[in-house]
Amino acid sequence: MKVDEALLGPWVRRFLLEHLVLERNLARNTQRSYRDTLVLLLPFVSTQCNKPIDRLRIDDLSPAIVRQFLAHLEQARHCAVATRNQRLGALPTLARFIALHSPQHVAWCGELRAIPLKKTPTPAVGYLEKPEMEALLQAPNQQTVQGRRDYAVLLFLYNTGARATEVAEVQVGALSFHGSPSVRLLGKGGKVRYCPLWATTTVPVLTRLVAGRRADEAVFLNRSHQPLTRFGIRTLVKRYADKARHQLPSLRTKSVTTHTIRHYLPFLTMSGNLSASTDVAGFHR
């Protein structure tokens, strides 16, 4: 076997730059997650094998080393089991890629893919009740530029049920205010969906927000006129949830996140309270 075929580094490079991007066309967040896993894994393996990273071989990434790495994540880095499982999820994909192009590593691939995910409890999905949603929407100070933008973010989350990543990546050109107002959202796996926008509330707010902006600009910008990140959006929700808790004690026992807001409208629909879903915070859709 040629030395280059046994080295792990060239395979990792092809995996990240060619396989995930060109062959699989995976979502950017998935690509970043796999990359971040290898950023943590390779130095760990290098230390355990007492080898420079660029001299690591495929066989150095043994099932035993991977199990040690997973234990390291939980014990030394204090990662949750869900995070541990997420990191593990990248490795079977890498192993399968190597085995497809290097058949002599099929057995190694099978051993690596046999490492099981750790079972985790499934938490109950939280939701907000109408007064709690009202309190959250009323929290931003709409007398300021930042407050109006933050209100627009919260209203957009409530209207669309979009994920934080989807909100961060939505562009001005994805908004349609004519006919039946809607927004084009790019979700997980590159799936596109269209969501109606409320003509009497969300549309006027977004119209003012994006007036005069280019179609390729992000809808929601930070103070530096850069796109809000998904982390920034989650922080924004947390900040106003903390503020709303002072006004509404019932929120003090709830974890309010973008995911919680995603479940507000389905809760109303399942409960049969359709009138409440059309009248929140003093406005109609």
Give short role names for the model-derived ranges:
Residues 1-285:
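Conserved catalytic core of the tyrosine transesterase superfamily
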